[in-house]
């Protein structure tokens, strides 16, 4: 208790020193995206009005008196004990389910409302004063010993981080995010700290805070380490509940042992995951989730889990580790099918996987060029021709393999769209634009492959098609790239035609 009191005193002192300096800052009300509320949507069950109890009809006959039964007191006593026992058990489970959802103390609620008012347009977005009030609200929570993992406590800390960002105090915001992440990570790793029924929600909050913190992160290697650390924690949680994921790892282990025995590439049996077996349709042709799949092991944090995996892929690309990005994406697509993710997201991930295979092929092409340059610089006596030939064959084989797999990924999305033509009619009705974007991206990807092979007329047509689709879906990033590649193709066609003449 003494140690707890000292920590609380230090925390309050630190905040008060900081709050006293806030009013001296200049305000920079730049627009920054608001944080999402980390709480699950509240149930409106308790707000429903109960129906009145109907009264007995006026002329209904009176019920005859029941004859008294022996040992009635004893039976009533037993019944009373049973009711008390059930009530105690019910109260215990109610307390456990609401332990992370405790309400703010009244003193903190008052300051919280004042802080919200200060950051509103009514007070000209006074973020400095709002920050001071949020810190004060957190102090009130500490004095009332509010659970540091509770939704309300975490929400106040996230609002403080948001104010830091709006005041361009990114280092302070990042430090607060790190403090939150450390607290959640420690709680999830200490046995009994988080109740089993609450682990999913706590993991969900942990991943959301992680994703938010990475929006202002500038250190790529640090970001990768954080992602890996928290993703492995979530993965272990899924593994403990999902027979499918256990089977996945067992099959991977068997495959690797077979590869060692017969000296094969572990990815020789690469297959795509876009098929009618994995993606279902309703009677009107709308893509739907497969309700027969049991994806409960991935709930309630599967959206956050796959967003974090995509971020890890992006960080790998930023650090030029294309092989790691590719490996992560292959696994992600397969797991998205297991987790019964929205069909459009599976399609888009498959198309993105094709792009990663093409990037890897480009890297291997650059490696081939380096080998050839090395050969031209060194004499035959200095160069070990046997080693050189082996290296060239290995790199060339892997490059061709990556190009082949990129085509498989793009082809699977386009062929799937052709086989299920109703997708085209419903593209504009879909709330999720990823379906149309995946088709546009795959069409563009096939154009890039055709350009790489020198089939200019086909490449030109595919680029034009992808531009049309990108405009329809407002896929501006793809639109810019497709227009650039179309211009390049047009120049090459003109040069080729001039050369023939």
Swiss-Prot record:
One of its GO terms (biological process) is protein quality control for misfolded or incompletely synthesized proteins. Keywords: Membrane, Mitochondrion, Mitochondrion inner membrane, Repeat, TPR repeat, Transmembrane, Transmembrane helix. The keyword Amino-acid biosynthesis does not apply. The chain crosses the membrane at residues 78-95. GO terms for molecular function: misfolded protein binding. InterPro entries: Mrg3-like (IPR040201). Residues 39-72 are annotated as: Disordered. It is a single-pass membrane protein. Residues 1-77 are mitochondrial matrix. TPR repeats lie at residues 109-144, 154-187, 386-420, 440-473. Disruption phenotype: Reduces proteolysis by YME1. The keyword Transmembrane applies. GO terms for cellular component: i-AAA complex; mitochondrial inner membrane; mitochondrion. It is found in: Mitochondrion inner membrane. Belongs to the MGR3 family. Component of the mitochondrial inner membrane i-AAA protease supercomplex, which degrades misfolded mitochondrial proteins. Together with MGR1, functions in an adapter complex that targets substrates to the i-AAA protease for degradation. Required for growth of cells lacking the mitochondrial genome. Present with 8970 molecules/cell in log phase SD medium. Component of the mitochondrial inner membrane i-AAA protease supercomplex composed of MGR1, MGR3 and YME1. With MGR1, forms a subcomplex that binds to YME1 and to substrates to facilitate proteolysis. This is Mitochondrial inner membrane i-AAA protease supercomplex subunit MGR3.
